[in-house]
Amino acid sequence: MRTPIIAGNWKMNNTISESLKLIEELKPLVKDAKAEVVVAPTAVSLETVVNATKGSNIKVAAQNAHFEESGAFTGEISLKALEELGVSYVILGHSERRQYFNETDCALNKKVKAAFAHNITPILCCGETLEEREANVTNEVTGKQIKLDLAGLSAEQAAKVVIAYEPIWAIGTGKTATDEQANETIGAIRKTVEVMFGKEVAEKVRIQYGGSVKPNTIKAQMAKPEIDGALVGGASLKAADFAAIVNF
């Protein structure tokens, strides 16, 4: 049985003080959650949020990282530094990173491996554009991303990866994939993992849905057999909304 995982991606929102306020509001609301709870604040708020969540059931994710341990990479953050900070997860390959910062699958593969080298679990994002969905190539697109991004991992590592399926056309638009579409695509992603690493690994991998997840959508989404959680954007910025999703 896979433990559900609900992660809140705060994106470029919340100052340090606002992040602390949100965490303090959130802690009592999710303390009895059956799902694993993760929040991803901005880089400047990471240390504050890590310290504020100590002793709670909330884990902390970074929103991105570089694959090199150190060097002349102005503005980047190393996984080595994130490990020392006490970060548990790192979001990799979010569609905004792929789209606005030209992240490639080659770089993401290096990042996934570097995350494991520093005991940080990747939340690996994949998804298709509206054009790709309408051309009926969703499974080809996500399958290719997964094959490239997870290439060279051991079965043990692959089983720990969290995958987030996020149809790009549903992010921040208010549109969502139907529960059936999400379940079907996530099933196809799981099949790709099975082909790469075997059935046992595929059955362990947790795959989230991301794309305008709200308190009024989560219950039906989580009722689908392939969906193991959610990567939540805007709704994670309000403690009550995010708690309602966590406590689906």
From Swiss-Prot:
Signal peptide start-end: none
Q: Which PANTHER family match?
A: TRIOSEPHOSPHATE ISOMERASE
Identify the pathway.
Answer: Carbohydrate biosynthesis; gluconeogenesis; Carbohydrate degradation; glycolysis; D-glyceraldehyde 3-phosphate from glycerone phosphate: step 1/1
PROSITE patterns registered for this protein in UniProt: TIM_1 (PS00171), TIM_2 (PS51440)
Query: What CDD domains is this protein classified in?
Result: TIM
Recorded GO CC terms: cytosol
Protein name per UniProt: Triosephosphate isomerase
Q: How does it assemble?
A: Homodimer.
Residues crossing the lipid bilayer are: none
Q: Which residues bind substrate?
A: N9, W10, K11, G172, S212, G233, G234
Q: Is the keyword Isomerase in the record? A: yes
Q: Which Pfam families match?
A: TIM (PF00121)
The EC number on file is 5.3.1.1
Q: Which residues form the active site?
A: H94, E166
What biological processes does GO assign it? gluconeogenesis; glyceraldehyde-3-phosphate biosynthetic process; glycerol catabolic process; glycolytic process
- Function in brief: Involved in the gluconeogenesis. Catalyzes stereospecifically the conversion of dihydroxyacetone phosphate (DHAP) to D-glyceraldehyde-3-phosphate (G3P).
UniProt entry keywords in alphabetical sequence: Cytoplasm, Gluconeogenesis, Glycolysis, Isomerase
Known catalytic reactions:
D-glyceraldehyde 3-phosphate = dihydroxyacetone phosphate
Give, as one word, the top-level EC class.
isomerase
Family that this chain belongs to: Belongs to the triosephosphate isomerase family.
Q: Does the keyword Isomerase apply?
A: yes
Query: Subcellular localization, per the record?
Result: Cytoplasm
A GO molecular-function descriptor = triose-phosphate isomerase activity
